[in-house]
């Protein structure tokens, strides 16, 4: 299924849903990110691209509270700088981690239900069914144990888990990893449908062409810093991205 093209105008209006200012993070004494500034508007898809080891996954973990960080993270007008993963989820910021492991001995249905901890009764069941509806390939196996799913289908299950709480911002780290081309399009189509329903998405994706077709804006990350911010409908974007990856000056302002 084809993904929808981005709008010709940015979706972000007014105050951003997510605002990251001066964020630095790493692992122990090893610094990875340096002074990251980033914004995402409500209902906007933003692609985060960069070479291997640029710090993309680290940035998502820092935003969601999985890693210690310095700087400021504001979400929905609330200061989340000191918040941990649970506080982030409760606020509507959900992070689907790359390589997320599902509970293989539980059914597909029960895996999705577990993601709705704290919810009860018919509301939870409704949310589970709504999440599975995005992925018919696993919905038809709802009563099968997750161990029977292919690796790509387990990745789809991980994304479905992230949808149960109807996040205001869904952060997807390499959602196409291990998927066939057909299933890649299924996941990215689901992302487009979520955007159309008002959910913002921060997308780390190795399939650059597909990511740019889907996203409204793009940030390029290299050597632990943001080296490019642009709208995806800019004519010179491929050239600017290539220069950004190799450390050349790409500081031209965004088109108005």
Language model feature labels by segment:
Residues 2-6, 10-256:
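Glycine-rich phosphate-binding loops of nucleotide-dependent enzymes
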């Amino acid at each position: 299924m084809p993904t929808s093209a981005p709008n010709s105008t940015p979706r972000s209006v007014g105050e951003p849903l997510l605002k990251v200012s001066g964020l630095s993070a790493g692992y122990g004494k090893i610094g990875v990110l340096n002074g990251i500034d980033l914004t995402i508007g409500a209902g906007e898809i933003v692609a985060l691209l960069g070479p291997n080891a640029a710090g993309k996954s680290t940035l998502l973990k820092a935003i969601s509270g999985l890693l210690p960080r310095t700087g400021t993270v504001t979400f929905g007008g609330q200061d989340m700088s000191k918040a941990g993963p649970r506080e982030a989820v409760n606020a509507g910021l959900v992070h689907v981690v790359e390589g997320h492991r599902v509970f293989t001995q539980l059914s597909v249905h029960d895996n999705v239900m577990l993601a709705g901890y704290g919810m009860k009764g018919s509301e939870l069941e409704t949310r589970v069914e709504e999440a599975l509806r995005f992925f018919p390939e696993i919905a038809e196996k709802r009563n099968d144990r997750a161990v029977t799913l292919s690796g790509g289908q387990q990745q789809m299950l991980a994304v479905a888990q992230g949808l149960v709480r109807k996040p205001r911002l869904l952060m997807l780290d390499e959602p196409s990893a291990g998927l066939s081309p057909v299933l890649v399009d299924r996941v990215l189509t689901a992302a487009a449908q979520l955007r159309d329903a008002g959910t913002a998405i921060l997308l780390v994706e190795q399939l650059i062409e597909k990511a740019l077709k889907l996203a409204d804006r793009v940030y390029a990350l290299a050597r632990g810093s943001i080296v490019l911010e642009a709208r995806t409908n800019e004519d010179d974007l491929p050239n600017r991205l290539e220069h950004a990856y190799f450390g050349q000056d790409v500081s031209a302002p965004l088109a108005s």
